[in-house]
């Protein structure tokens, strides 16, 4: 298993709040579109309520700076949930990027089975 380097850990702690803000801005734009629809006010209200409840479970909203040992899982989850892309990891070490790619491949393979 890949050992997380201090440089990667510090970079993650720096980038996480930025990633979360960008993700939440995207969610807010999607909520605004939902509210602009021609549906009845009650339908929009309950659809928005349901959506926000679901989005609260997303790593882009709820992840905090957990321990270094969970970094690999968190990055993989953030990519799978489309909070960030593989390109967002370009400043991280090559080892971490490769390890994350392997985790994603394993996840996708398991989904296909």
Feature names for model-found ranges:
Residues 1-113:
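Acidic, Ser/Pro/Thr-rich low-complexity regulatory regions
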């Amino acid at each position: 298993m890949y050992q997380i380097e201090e440089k990667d850990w510090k970079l993650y702690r720096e980038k996480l709040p930025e990633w979360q803000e960008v993700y939440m801005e995207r969610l807010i734009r999607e909520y605004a579109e939902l509210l602009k629809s021609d549906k009845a006010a009650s339908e929009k209200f309950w659809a928005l309520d349901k959506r926000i409840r679901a989005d609260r479970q997303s790593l882009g909203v709820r992840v905090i700076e957990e321990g270094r040992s969970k970094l690999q899982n968190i990055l993989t989850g953030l990519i799978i949930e489309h909070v960030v892309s593989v390109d967002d990891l370009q400043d991280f070490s090559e080892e971490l990027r490769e390890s994350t790619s392997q985790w994603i491949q394993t996840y996708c393979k398991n989904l296909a089975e």
